[in-house]
Amino acid sequence: MKNLIQSILHSHLIPSCPHADLCGAGGRAWLFHQVLPEDERLAVERHLREFDRLGEDLKVIERDLARSALGNEGVKRLMTIPGVDMVVALAIAAAIGEVRRFDRPEKLVGYLGLNPSVRQSGPGPAYHGRITKQGRGHARGMLVEAAWAAARTPGPLRAFFLRVRARRGQHVAAVATARKLAVIIWHLLSKGESYAWARPALHARKLRDLELKAGYRAERGQKGAAHAYNIKSHRDQERRWVEQAEAAYARFVAGWNPRGPKRARTGAANEGRR
């Protein structure tokens, strides 16, 4: 709707709105003072009404999603992972269904299309290429978006992202982090555990936001479960804790000498060694 309104303004050489939100209170007041033909003004008003209607429908959908998330322990457990919010957690949980269908994390990775493709001819060596991109593409895209968010949050996941980015670039690092998230998600859902490096105050804040979106009453002036997140010293303490975990992970893997799988020698190679 905003783009349609912008196109009408642009067709009449009206400059861009000085307000950040064209459909906000300030933007609408600015629109009211613009000189437009009567039919174009009616079109702008029609687009604004449609924008408001869609906004109300989205609020209802968001409320229903929040209520569904609050009643699902698996979704709340996934939200302990940095970068995973309500939408990502619900999408992943819906795509996975019953996690017992996957007896190993590698099977979940393959189901989401995050495993590398393998090409092999006869007894020759196997060549690993790009990810297969098979399976649930929507969930895979959600995990990649969560990986980008996790890369901006201190913790072992960011250390992993930075390590891969230094060797392969940021896009490969994002996909590798998404695969790492899929493995973590399998373990959390299979074992009924929360993320080991979760920030309790931040998770409590996420859950409180869920309650407000679900229509729970706002209790102003009272210390709720998310009160600790409002204390800066507490937030800083949790941040230092995960930064220490990130530094420990970086030190741990600094001495690794990654090697690929051993390749079986072909007959010609064995004859040459004799």
Show where each model-derived region lies.
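A detector of single, family-specific signature residues
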Residues: 1-274
